[in-house]
A protein has these predicted regions:
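A short, basic-hydrophobic beta/loop patch
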Residues: 81-138
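Intrinsically disordered, low-complexity boundary segments flanking structured domains
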Residues: 1-5, 25, 32, 66-76, ...
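Surface-exposed, charge/polar-rich loops and edge strands
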Residues: 1-41, 59, 116-138
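Short alpha-helix boundary/capping and kink motifs at helix termini
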Residues: 35-99, 111
Length: 138
């Protein structure tokens, strides 16, 4: 698939100053396999609860970061067997971090159903960079 410069018809995920083309990431995984990502059959989900709470915030409390999803879609149209996509984030200082760039609806459903694990792909730094879209394009 050839992407337009603006990724207008691509599925993308944006978080603060970063944006990724999910279509590109999936294409790289299909084409390059382990050069693009490492498959993990059971990734722990409980650490994501802080970003995707199962219940609304208590009155008087504010969440600084919250991933917004369509709850009805998450519970009725997601397939939990499809691996989520996780991208490494290299900070200016300190250890690398990671972020879910595709699969937040699946994470929500899994957590609502009491599951603690889902399969995931961890992109390599190469695939993360190839999938990243400059935020000023969109």
């Amino acid at each position: 698939m050839t992407h337009s410069p603006g990724h207008e018809h691509c599925q993308t995920f944006r978080f603060v100053a970063w944006q990724w083309c999910i279509d590109t990431a999936e294409e790289l995984i299909r084409a390059d396999g382990e050069a693009a990502a490492t498959f993990h059959p059971q990734g722990i989900l409980t650490s994501l609860d802080q970003f995707l709470p199962l219940e609304p915030a208590r009155p008087g409390f504010l969440r600084l970061i919250e991933i917004e999803i369509d709850h009805d879609y998450a519970m009725t149209r997601t397939e939990l067997v499809k691996p989520i996509l996780v991208a490494p984030i290299e900070p200016e200082k300190g250890d690398n971090g990671v972020i879910v760039i595709d699969g937040w609806h699946r994470v929500y459903r899994a957590r609502k159903e009491g599951r603690e694990y889902l399969p995931f792909y961890l992109l390599t730094p190469y695939a993360e960079q190839k999938s990243r879209v400059p935020v000023w394009i969109r």
